[in-house]
From Swiss-Prot:
It comes from Bos taurus (Bovine). This is Probable RNA polymerase II nuclear localization protein SLC7A6OS. It is found in: Cytoplasm; Nucleus. One of its GO terms (biological process) is protein transport. Directs RNA polymerase II nuclear import. Residues 233-307 are annotated as: Disordered. InterPro entries: SLC7A6OS, TF_Iwr1_dom.
Length: 307
């Protein structure tokens, strides 16, 4: 089985801060010249590629930049596919939040310079070792830069020296005098140098091409899901948009027809009531002359007209 292209990140981190278990590097891939010769020529539109996300897994942490990374990569690449699946499962199942803050800055990039071709090895199912191709190795050096607030918090949480005398949580001047009397020495410089460690992150690329045009480097969290960013908004289901709900705006119908029917019904009721009153008045009005005739002892209705 041919070994894929391997990319390595070496991050310079201040001692005492938590390392990120994985880094997500967004970049645009640049195809190598050898691959361009093998592949057929394509149009300029086909050569343009969108940004892609690459997940680098934490392999190990070393104390010095001079320490070789080949043995660490050899152990990490031996069960290549199984390791990535196991690490991904561990990252997603972990409930611990990454406390890493700040940003990562790329300071150096190298493609297989000064690394022997037989330094990187990967074993197949039978256990035989194969030398990795020297042209398929890329190393990038990064520096983790902390924010000012995070750096101040890290300094405040640093373990105190038992020889330091404090008064109301304030260090006495004696410690400052001792530091001023001691000139710069190699021991002090070595102590400052030992304040940093180097985290090694590895990615075995199955697709050809070098990592170029780095856009961003971010810590990988267990909530990070590499989904398609081109997902259409209409494909996303909204929990609140329930068509069967009574409060949904789709279920609100206009009440104009009902109001017209109510007005018609009220008008017909008024008309019928007025007709009933008129009908009741007619017999009463027709009966009125007879009542008057009887009361005043008139013989005929003409006598009422003469009066």
């Amino acid at each position: 089985m041919e070994a894929g292209r391997t990319a390595v990140l070496r991050v310079k981190r201040k001692l005492g801060t938590e390392p990120a278990e994985a880094l997500v590097l967004a970049c645009k891939r640049l195809r190598s010249s050898a691959v361009e010769l093998e592949t057929p020529k394509t149009s300029p539109e086909g050569l343009e590629r969108a940004a892609e996300n690459n997940v680098f897994q934490l392999v190990a942490t070393v104390r010095s930049q001079e320490e070789p990374v080949q043995p660490l990569l050899r152990a990490a690449l031996r069960p290549s596919q199984g390791s990535q699946q196991r690490i991904r499962h561990h990252l997603r199942a972990s409930a611990r939040e990454i406390r890493q803050e700040g940003r990562y800055r790329v300071v150096f990039s190298r493609r297989s310079s000064g690394i022997p071709s037989d330094s990187l090895e990967s074993e197949d199912a039978s256990g035989t070792a194969k030398a990795a191709d020297d042209a398929n190795f890329q190393l990038l050096d990064l520096v983790h830069e902390e924010d000012a607030e995070v750096a101040a918090a890290a300094i405040s949480c640093k373990k105190s020296d038992p020889d330091v005398i404090l008064c109301n949580c304030v260090e006495l001047i004696r410690e400052g005098l001792n530091v001023s009397q001691c000139g710069p020495s190699s021991g002090h410089q070595k102590e400052q140098k030992d304040d940093f460690v180097y985290d090694i992150y590895c990615l075995e690329r199955a697709t050809p091409g070098w990592i170029e045009n780095i856009l961003s480097v971010q810590p990988y969290s267990h909530e990070w899901e590499l989904v398609n960013d081109d997902q259409q908004p209409e494909d996303i289901y909204d929990d609140e948009d329930d068509e069967n709900s009574e409060n949904n705006w789709r279920n609100e119908y206009p009440e104009e027809e009902n109001s017209d029917e109510d007005e018609d019904s009220r008008g017909s009721d008024n008309y019928s009531s007025s007709e009933e009153r008129d009908n009741s008045r007619q017999p009463m009005w027709s009966k009125y002359p007879l009542d008057v005739q009887k009361e005043f002892d008139y013989d005929s209705p003409h006598d009422l007209d003469s009066d």
